[in-house]
Structure formats: C-alpha cells, structure tokens
C-alpha cells in the first residue's frame, strides 16, 4: 500500500514504515505524532486505486517526526566580468524527516 501526499507544497510517495523528508514542520518536536490529511491518491494492497479531487476525504496518514535538520549547503555565486565583483552566498534548507506509521482508509 502506498499513497501520494502533499506536504510543504511538494508531493511525496509514502509507504508504511518508510521515512520521507519534507519542508520543516513548525510547532512539532522530535518523536511527536503528525497527521497528514492532504492525500491525493492511495493504492491499496488489493490493487484498488483511490484518486481525490483534489484530496481524499476518507484517508488519514499517521506518522512520527524522526528529526529536524538542515540539508547540505548550496553555494550561489554572483559574478560581473571586468568589474572585480564577486559574491558567494551559501544556503542550508531546513527539513523534517517523518516516518509513516500507517495509512488508514475509512
């Protein structure tokens, strides 16, 4: 069984027991339970496919926050030829790792 869920403006394929990385979830700490209710699609174990318009009302995904962290640094540079102008800036994006516990189809 797997589901397509929307979190942080992006879509993820999630399965029970697997961990996925999304934008930082504010207000929740490590070890706390989260419920993902923006479920776009579910494929059950018996091959049945449920598609939402845009979301499924009767599906709930429960997960646990594994960790909050920051991704690897992305280096961005600006350069102007012949003007002796160079700027380098780094950015590290916050993320939250969520382990999916179960997918409930009501």
UniProtKB/Swiss-Prot annotation:
Q: Which Pfam families does the record associate with it?
A: Ribosomal_L21p
Superkingdom of the source? Bacteria
What Gene Ontology molecular function terms does this protein carry?
A: rRNA binding; structural constituent of ribosome
Keyword list (alphabetical) reads: Ribonucleoprotein, Ribosomal protein, RNA-binding, rRNA-binding
* Cystine pairings recorded for this chain: none
Q: Which GO terms describe its cellular component?
A: cytoplasm; ribonucleoprotein complex; ribosome
Entry coiled-coil feature ranges: none
**Keyword rRNA-binding part of the UniProt annotation:** yes
What InterPro entries has UniProt attached to this entry? Answer: bL21-like, bL21-like_sf, Ribosomal_bL21, Ribosomal_bL21_CS
Gene Ontology biological process terms in this record: translation
By sequence similarity, the record places it as follows: Belongs to the bacterial ribosomal protein bL21 family.
Q: What does this protein do?
A: This protein binds to 23S rRNA in the presence of protein L20.
What is known about its subunit structure?
Part of the 50S ribosomal subunit. Contacts protein L20.
Q: What is the protein name given in its UniProt record?
A: Large ribosomal subunit protein bL21
Supply the gene name: rplU
């Amino acid at each position: 069984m797997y589901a397509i869920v929307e979190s942080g403006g992006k879509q993820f394929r999630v399965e029970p027991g697997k961990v996925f990385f999304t934008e930082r979830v504010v207000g929740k700490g490590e070890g706390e339970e989260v419920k993902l209710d923006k479920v776009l699609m579910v494929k059950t174990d018996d091959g049945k496919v449920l598609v939402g318009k845009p979301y499924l009302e009767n599906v709930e995904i429960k997960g646990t926050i594994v960790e909050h962290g920051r991704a690897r640094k992305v280096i961005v540079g600006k350069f102007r030829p012949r003007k002796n102008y160079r700027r380098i800036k780094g950015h590290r994006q916050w993320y939250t790792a969520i382990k999916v516990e179960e997918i409930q189809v009501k």
